[in-house]
């Protein structure tokens, strides 16, 4: 998946779980990033590199696998395919975004 495809899918999933995370999250990929500000309504989702409470670094391919339910996010983290910095509790809430 490329960044535009991932961004579109995250926007779709976020509309279903708006308000549950209540944090600022940044996903860093091979070809850019996605910033999600879920502290405001409506949720802001863009490709700007902004400060976040939690930053998750993962490849486009591995994130695509998580979105398509081909890979578990916990498994990706435990195997080192996904790195998390910042507030770990925010990262733990992200499962609500992918359910």
Whereabouts are the PLM-identified features?
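Feature captures hydrophobic
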Residues: 1-99
């Amino acid at each position: 998946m490329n960044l535009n495809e991932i961004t579109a899918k995250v926007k779709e999933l976020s509309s279903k779980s708006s308000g549950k995370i209540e944090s600022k999250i940044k996903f860093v990929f091979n070809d850019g990033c996605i910033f999600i500000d879920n502290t405001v309504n409506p949720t802001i989702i863009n490709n700007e590199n902004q400060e976040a409470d939690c930053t998750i670094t993962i490849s486009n391919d591995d994130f695509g696998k998580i979105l398509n339910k081909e890979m578990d996010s916990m498994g990706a983290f435990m195997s080192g395919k996904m790195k998390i910095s910042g507030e770990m509790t925010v990262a733990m809430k992200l499962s609500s975004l992918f359910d």
